[in-house]
Amino acid sequence: MDLYPESILNLIKSLSTLPGIGRRTAERLALHILHAPLHEAQTLANDILELKQKVTLCRTCFSLSDQPECRICSNPRRDASIICVVEKPTDIVAIEKSGAFSGLYHVLGGALSPMDGIGPDELRIRELFSRACSKTTTEVIIATGTNVEGEATAAYISDQLRKKGVNVTRIASGVPMGGDFQYVDQVTMQRAMEGRRGF
């Protein structure tokens, strides 16, 4: 039997639908919000509404943006001749944190997965081909995941773009910094050995 008032139970139920939030965490969050000052609860509610109302997809790269074009695509200092292809907007965040890339991005919206009914038409591959085949593009870097779906997506895009004469590269994968060899799987070790370079 639930001993909380219905409004608290409703919030617990809503919060527990979020990824990684179970009932106990949702309960703690709901009680925290209940005991927080009213202006904090209003700010949280307003931020959620603003997020839903303002955040959309960039018309160029399909990343998250609150403007028609995202901050990266509208930045004249970015190298518009190189496009890095990723599966989701959070992949851009990871690459940007590294500081290793200064070009533009293209978010596919997932990876090919025939078992789940996701083919090329369900992703933003057609839009990628249109951008990649422009005269200003000199290279397309494929930065999809290293799982089966990511590799299949990379292979498909690479094959199609090479037929169109586009220079395509794939990000390297291998042993992580500080990684212990005994925990590295065979495929990762094989790729690390194949992708080795001069020192």
Swiss-Prot record:
Q: Does the keyword Transmembrane helix apply?
A: no
Q: Name one GO biological process term.
A: DNA recombination
Q: Which UniProt keywords apply?
A: DNA damage, DNA recombination, DNA repair, Metal-binding, Zinc, Zinc-finger
Q: Which residues form the Toprim domain?
A: 81-176
User: Which CDD domains does its entry note?
Assistant: TOPRIM_recR
Thylakoid in keyword set: no
Pfam families for this protein: RecR_C, RecR_HhH, RecR_ZnF, Toprim_4
> Which SMART domains does this chain map to?
TOPRIM
Question: Which GO molecular function, any one, fits this protein according to its record?
Answer: zinc ion binding
Zn finger (C4-type) start-end: 58-73
PANTHER family (UniProt xref)? RECOMBINATION PROTEIN RECR
Similarity section? Belongs to the RecR family.
Q: Which HAMAP family match?
A: RecR
Known role: May play a role in DNA repair. It seems to be involved in an RecBC-independent recombinational process of DNA repair. It may act with RecF and RecO.
Protein name in UniProt: Recombination protein RecR
What is this organism's lineage?
A: Bacteria, Pseudomonadati, Thermodesulfobacteriota, Desulfobacteria, Desulfobacterales
